[in-house]
Amino acid sequence: MNGKGSVVVPIKWKIAVAILFLLCVGLLIALIVVAVVFSQYRDKYPSDTESNTCAEGILNEGEPPKTKGIFNDLTSEELIAARDFMLKQSSLKLKRIENASVKDNYIYMIQLHPPEKAAVLDYLEEDKAKPARKALVVIFEGEGSPPFVQEYIVTWPNNSGEMTYEKRNGNPILFNVRPYDQVQRKALTKIVLEATTKAFRLLNESYDGFCYHNCTNKLLKFHPQGPFGKTRDERTTWLQFTRDLEGGSLNPVDFQLYIDFPGSDVSKWKINKVYYNGQTFNTVDDLLFQYNKLNAISKSFIPAPKTPLFSSYDPSGIPLSQKARRSPRMFEPDGKRFSVSGRHIKYMQWSFDFRMDSVSGPQLFDIRFKDKRIIYELSLQEAISFYSGFSPYFMAANFVYGGWAMGTKTFELVGGVDCPETSKFFDVVHFVDTDQPQVIKNAVCVFEMDSGIPLRRHFETNGTGYKFYEGLASRVLVLRTIITVRNYDNIFDFVFYQSGAIEVKSTPTGYVQSENDRPEVEDDLFGHEIHTKLLGNLHDQIFHYKVDLDVDGRSNSIEKIEISTQDTANDWLPPERRILKVLRSQVMRLETDSAEVKKIDFDKPTFFNVYSDNKNKFDSKRGYLIQPLSAVKQLLPENYFITKMAPWSVYPLVVTRYKETELRSSSLYNQNSPTQPVVDFESFFQSANDRITNVDLVAWVSIGCIEIPSSEDVPNVASAANTARFFLQPFNYFDEGPSTDSSNAVFIKQDEDKSNVAQSSVLSDEEVCVPKKYDINLKGSYE
């Protein structure tokens, strides 16, 4: 301290303060820089905690379509109204299905009865009256003598008035051809329970503690085989028993019952045969008598599967990497590029309506490109799976899935697995084998995706570098549903390309059916051993589609274009000759002409063109090619009674004249009427007088695959390499490729200074967004 009382600050403290000040200034500058950079980074790469999630887009855009209410399935309210209306008709003597017996009258199914095509087009194009809403009601009339199935059409008036009903033409239908339902199952269960109660010890000893009743968590369950006999006069089925475990179809036991259950008098239903361990017996008592005798028959023992269960989906095996990484995800930076109004979809230049038929599955209507109808109806008609095997069940198992109401088996879809997380999901409602409408959540999905390949591209080089590049990613719209009939899950896709093409795909996955391997069977005759003493049965999967094309109007013809070779003189260098590929076109004039397409001739590649006499600006007839890329041969003889259930499976392609009496190629009843199918597809084209030139045409397309199960199909069949498909491809329909209208094309060329100049109307450096989180979840209830 000096004489004036002031404090002398040492120089070292002054230096320390100065350094500290500079450090603070530097830290402040650094914080400012970090804040600016972080702000820029956050704007470009927002975190999950930010609100900058990807937009949903506009899903309901513009005025409601004129097709609203035309193709939509009946709502729950409409289904209930139709049910209550029919229950009030005292002359029908109806009971509710939960209180009904086989000998009663009850409603089996209610669904939309689509309006006639002519009435729809009169409304859409001529502004005539809107077609009335109608319901198809199927009633099992067990009280009749004889009992039968009767179909009714219930109509709602467009204006004031009461609902009406009338019998549908072509009815009644014989009782024995009706589909399987809960009422029959209850009656069969009593027969099975009586038989398995007697055989309790046999089942318990043979199957390691498993039995049909009083076995706690070691239960067996049964499955009927179709068809139910050969003719309409009989109704029989083999019941296969499997363990009630995950993947039950991979856990069969060698015990089967042959049930005779015709008519409505259940007192006459009985067991005609019993199969056990490769042997058959007339009755359960006969089997037990032999079983209890010392060494009288060969006894079976099939041990219960061990834990972890081989047929389960629970993850097993070694992880593919030590540190699991999340898989790539789809996202939509600007929201969805398609709009939805009810069941009406608009995407780019495409638009269509869709519904879910309870019997046959997905149906698309009024498919337009650039607001011009190309297809009136594109729909799944039927699916079959015919099996081979040693046991009586598999010798007789030939499934026609429409007979099991496969359209009702469109269960919930899981986002991120079954469909991309960005999908728009739709509920469906059915009234089949129930007393109340059943709403199935998220049964259909619609999404846009990048197909992973350019729709078009070209790289032009001058030898030393490039001159230009042009390309367009193939982004498509997909409508998907998955139908699960017991063990198989069939994925059905309708894919819309910006080129004007439509791809239709059917992809089987799920579990295979299997039987216990038998030592006396010739090696690999009916399939391979896919697990310990378990045979994966050989079978096919064939799908049938209806394609009601309206190419530039309803007046169409079809030509067959064959590619062959021709020995041609080279007039430019005589006397040389050349073998050249040539086109040879032949107009199919009669329905019987198109029915001749029963096989694919690889010696003469063939294309089928449905065309209009209207021409494009190059004087070519506007047309659409039908390309059944996955045609599969029906190996069973054409006149075999099993083939007669699905005669369409013989023909890769048939073209017929549109008729209101030929709306479906199969029916709810074809499964159980093999020798006399209720809908005989071959009758569609047996007349030699039905011309198919310049008329409204319908194409019927079959695709499929033959399945040889292998050990890799356990626990589940992979979808890879199993897809069956066909294309509908524009053929001189447009004056140029319609994808040239796309705003997503990329064009790159060099400027004068040799720098790259990229042209695209969609900028890639726009602000990004975070995909919304999607919780994997199932509703699990259908009420």
Where are these regions (language model features)?
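Short, low-complexity, Lys/Arg-enriched N-terminal segments of secretory-pathway carbohydrate enzymes
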Residues: 1-15
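Extended effector regions of multi-domain proteins
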Residues: 15-132, 136-231, 235-362, 366-499, ...
